[in-house]
Design a protein with these regions (language model features):
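Conserved signature/switch motifs of ABC ATPase nucleotide-binding domains
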Residues: 128-131, 149
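Short coil-to-helix segment of the ABC ATPase nucleotide-binding domain corresponding to the Q-loop/switch region
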Residues: 89-96
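Conserved ABC ATPase "signature" region
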Residues: 100, 107-125, 176-177
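The feature captures the beta-strand-to-loop junction immediately N-terminal to the Walker
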Residues: 41-43
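Conserved ABC transporter NBD signature motif
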Residues: 64-74
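Hydrophobic anchor residue at the start of the ABC signature
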Residues: 79, 143
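Helix-to-loop junction immediately C-terminal to a conserved catalytic motif
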Residues: 56
Length: 247
């Protein structure tokens, strides 16, 4: 077993609201290993996105702490529900934005951007603007942008929630293949049981607010995963177990 990449200890998040205190996360404890894919599930309001934002450094915890195994903060890529692309920038320009921010030289930036465009299957759309892309293509651009600086940790906040069912399922396969190629540590918030089981190595289920870990389930399914695995008896058993924990 790998050493934990992330350790969360007694982490709580509270907000003052209308003269009262709203506790979103309550003394959360968990460990996550490097190079694994985690799905984070639970009822709406259970603190899934809040935890993601804390790990990304976007908001602080109220109490408790989280640490990274290497002793230093990893580089992080994040993808939200909406692609949040800059509408005036082409596919190429949107993807290479993190390299521009980090002042990567032009030759290296062009090479990395070209490789990433090929990896996410957008060859031929390099000069397209976001308005000319389908929802699935826009999310591929967002994922490519998050991956281009080779982050240690990829955080995904329901990245496929706004897509139609068929596109969403195709994106599962594409993301699974991307993970297989890169083996990054991924934490994904989702409400979909099938999505969790198809993509993740482990599924963490949070309780109703205030969020605590209710279930930590290993997804014992072989990789690489193909669409057909969703119709196997083992997949069905895991789905039933997971549904019971969420309900």
């Amino acid at each position: 077993m790998s050493d934990p990449m992330i350790r969360v200890r007694d982490l709580s998040k509270r907000y003052a609201r209308g003269g009262e205190t709203l506790t979103v996360l309550d003394r959360l404890n968990l460990e996550m290993e490097e190079g694994r894919f985690y799905a984070l599930m639970g009822p709406s309001g259970s603190g899934k996105t809040t935890l993601l934002r804390i790990l990304a450094g976007l908001i602080p915890p109220t109490s408790g702490a989280f640490t990274f195994g290497r002793g230093e903060e990893p580089s992080i890529g994040m993808v939200f529900q909406q692609a949040t692309l800059m509408p005036w920038r082409t596919v190429t320009e949107n993807i290479r934005l993190p390299l521009e921010v980090n002042k990567v030289d032009e030759t290296t930036a062009l090479k990395k951007t070209s490789e990433m465009i090929e990896l996410v299957g957008l060859t031929g759309f390099e000069d397209s603007l976001p308005r000319d892309l389908s929802g699935g293509m826009a999310q591929r651009v967002a994922i490519a942008r998050a991956l281009i600086h080779d982050p240690d940790l990829l955080l995904l906040d329901e990245p496929f929630a706004s897509l139609d069912a068929m596109t969403r399922e195709r994106m599962w396969t594409e993301l699974s293949n991307l993970w297989q190629a890169r083996q990054k540590t991924v934490i994904m918030v989702t409400h979909s049981i099938n999505e969790s089981l198809f993509l993740a190595d482990r599924v963490l289920v949070l309780t109703q607010r205030p969020g605590k870990i209710k279930m930590d389930m290993e997804v014992d399914l072989p990789r690489p995963r193909k669409d057909e695995i969703r119709y196997t008896s083992q997949f069905g058993k895991l789905a039933k177990k997971l549904r019971g924990a969420i309900e």
